[in-house]
Amino acid sequence: MHYLLLKLKSISLAGAFHENHDMPRSLNRLVKNPADRNGKAAKLLGSLLMFLKSTPYIYEGEEIGMINNERSSIDEFDDISSHNQYTRALEEGYSKEEALHFVNRRSRDNTRSPMCWNSSEYGGFSDVKLWLALNEHASEINVEKQINDPDFVLSFYKNAIALRQENVDLIVDGSFEALDTCDEVVAYRRANDSEEIICINNMSERNMK
């Protein structure tokens, strides 16, 4: 992405995203330790995305930090490619448990499940049975729980969007420079003639100096 941004420079804006309907949740893909797939990590990924010289695309549920849904049977999947992957894994000699593990990690159903608006039976999305089961974390990760709390992921994204809107000359139109760091830190500088911001993101599990 940094290479693309440098090549485009002032010619055009790239479209940047962490998630879409054809991939698992970004917290599961990009955060190795399951214990770290939390609000802090979701904000970090948001920081990586929102201040680039690009048009950021926020996929439904990303703004509240939704993560993959662990399913206990292949019958719980709707995505045809997930069923094909499961069958192929069995044909290659993997056990049913191993095949299901692979599918849970990779399935497109992870980002195709209903939006979690609240902790009710169908997550505030509907009052009838859903085409896919509600995410198992819906009672903890939902819009209603986050909407009035400034410390949650949703507030971070709202503030980041407001910051972009208030600083178009800097964050949208300003220059972009990737900063030289170690492999576990992603940092970049945005600047115009009078202001600058430096965005530093520690992707490791330890404090960095």
Regions found by a protein language model. Give the residues of each.
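Active-site and adjacent substrate-binding regions of carbohydrate-active enzymes
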Residues: 1-209
